[in-house]
Design a protein with these regions (language model features):
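Active-site-proximal helix/loop segments of hydrolytic enzymes
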Residues: 2-156
Length: 156
């Protein structure tokens, strides 16, 4: 699948860079802690002309780092893919994603762990799907964004 291919390539990149990487299943460990938790998804829509990349952290942000993580990763993905920004279509479910919603769900990241849900593009759009057939494109962009973020907050 698209998501798994990107996640595996991303984990490989980050491991090569010396990071400790946890590839998690849909069930997040209770109060999971990390420098960042990135949940990778692909979207679809009956309107096959809808396309673009979007991402979201909880709103309001659970911590001051989430907006910085979003900006760093978004910047790199947009540079790498030249996709349109689809943030206007961020859903309420994305904003209250269970893996980041420690108040409602036991199996969620700790509040201090910055989280970001990324929607790589639309499986229902040919242009986005063409890009998503190259998992390395997204893995490299997300890895670079994560490095930028960690440098910005002084963790690298």
């Amino acid at each position: 699948t698209v998501n798994l291919a990107v996640v595996e390539a991303l984990a490989e990149r980050l491991t090569e860079l010396g990071f400790e990487v946890d590839v998690l299943t849909a069930t997040v460990p209770v109060r999971y802690t990390a420098d960042a938790l990135i949940s990778v998804h692909a979207d679809a829509n009956p309107d096959t002309t809808r396309r673009g990349y979007k991402s979201a952290h909880t709103r309001p942000a659970r911590n001051a780092l989430e907006p910085l993580l979003k900006l760093a990763i978004d910047r790199r993905v947009f540079l790498a893919t030249d996709q349109p920004d689809d943030d206007r279509n961020v859903s309420g479910n994305m904003l209250q994603y269970y893996a980041f919603n420690h108040q409602r769900f036991r199996h969620a990241a700790a509040p201090r762990t910055p989280g970001l849900l990324v929607e790589l593009g639309y499986l229902s759009n040919d242009a986005d799907m063409t890009l998503m057939r190259d998992p390395d494109l997204y893995a490299d962009a997300i890895a670079r964004g994560l490095v930028d973020y960690l440098q910005e907050i002084g963790r690298l």
